[in-house]
Regions:
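C-terminal cap of metal-dependent C-N hydrolases
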Residues: 89-103, 108, 113-118, 122, ...
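Short acidic/histidine-rich active-site segments
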Residues: 27-29, 60-83, 136
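Short alpha-helix capping/helix-loop boundary micro-motifs
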Residues: 124-129
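Active-site core of metal-dependent hydrolases
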Residues: 1-54, 68, 145, 161
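Divalent metal-coordination and catalytic microenvironments
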Residues: 4, 18, 60, 72, ...
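Histidine/acidic-residue-rich catalytic or RNA/ligand-binding cores of hydrolases
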Residues: 16, 35-41, 73-92, 154
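Short, glycine-/Ser/Thr-/acidic-enriched flexible segments
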Residues: 9-11, 30-33, 72-76, 89-91, ...
Length: 161
């Protein structure tokens, strides 16, 4: 399956092409907030308007793109709940929801979980083994003290530290 990794800055006219061509957009969700690297290195080089066109997850989803998440570890954290929470809050995981970055592009918790599990397994040709909780499929379990689906988005990134 064709995949574009680090699909962070996509032109409007190219968004529907992901679905048309069956290309998976692999995105690293921990970059979906305005971090110091973005402010200091990226924004000054590409400009504010173009910078705010990065990580348009909601727009890509509306255009029919299949999105799968990856950790980008060791460059970013390997903690899955942070990676699942950031595209929902669009905020720095260390600060909670203080200054969401282009919040109109935020995902729901269910969408973020799906991109990190089911769609990631599909991208890896492992959907028959992983990705959803079904009889006969393998799973790695993480015990949490609360239900991520019932938590405010800002709390998701705090569930595992």
């Amino acid at each position: 399956r064709p995949v574009i990794v680090h699909a962070q800055l996509i032109r409007d006219e190219d968004m529907p092409r992901f679905a048309q061509l069956g290309v998976i957009a692999n995105i690293q969700p921990l970059w979906c907030y305005l971090d110091p690297m973005n402010k200091e290195l990226i924004a000054p080089r590409i400009g504010s308007e173009r910078n705010n066109q990065q990580y348009r997850l909601r727009s890509m989803l509306k255009a029919g793109a299949m999105i799968a998440f990856g950790s980008d570890w060791p460059v970013t954290s390997h903690v899955p709940m942070q990676a699942i929470g950031v595209p929902v809050t669009r905020s720095n995981p260390a600060d909670g929801v203080t200054h969401p970055w282009v919040f109109k592009e935020a995902l729901t918790m269910d969408e973020s979980l799906t991109f990190y599990t089911k769609n990631a397994a599909y991208q890896l040709f492992r959907e028959d083994e992983y990705g959803v909780l079904e009889v006969g499929k393998r799973a790695t379990f993480l015990v949490l003290d609360s239900d991520p689906a019932q938590n405010p988005a800002a709390k998701i990134i705090e569930l595992v530290s």
